[in-house]
């Protein structure tokens, strides 16, 4: 791994002078911005490994590599987008502080990025978010506000509360995925994969990417467009919330009704974000889904074969490779294992019954 020591983000902010206004059109997520994000983020995060197993290759019938982003600072890929977004704040925004809504991973990442930059952070989280994620966000230094969503979508309710707090306290309102600067930050994950692949003279045929709001897959697809070798980028979602798959078919953003029931709690967005969907719709080849049982089995295999802990959302790409193996015969796959924020109690509960 590289870059375990995160530098002072007040100094790093200088590298983001001239950052575009996130409110403007998504055409700004170009090669120049992606390079800017790469220069800012690559020395401020862990360079997470690509893991390989001959056993997994034999099971899937393909050459399979896991990008173990569960080992990232903060436990997920969200650290990349949070670091770059915070580095682009104005001095006035830094003084007032920031607010965001999140079910957990962006919450912790933004809290850590804000603490290192000296920026006050308030996070609005659903009251039913995993207790472990709430505790870790508070431990990272953020003020946490919990919401009760009732029968409504929990992300929608948390988003409304965050907007109200931003207006009341003059906080900068940051979105966990619907922001071009966050998307650019997330693109650095795929940049690492590309560097490692070139070093090992490996041609990647397909990248299986988890999708919640779409920030990671948009960054991945854009990085592959500008710096890659033409790998197919495939969206992976739980059966219960396949809004990206449906959106790719209809060519418009489809919504989930209520809060989808799935163990993949980090993937319960209302719909794909406008920014990531517009930026990457034409770059994503297709969407596929898997059920929660497949995710449970993938979590167990990740632990037993690779000795890594994945949360459900972090294991879903592996689940797709295993469950839909006939689609990937003799190909070289990279599975983006995007996070590992799960308590030991939940890990044992979710993996003890994998029928």
Predicted regions and their residues:
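PLP-dependent amino-acid enzyme catalytic core
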Residues: 11, 18-355
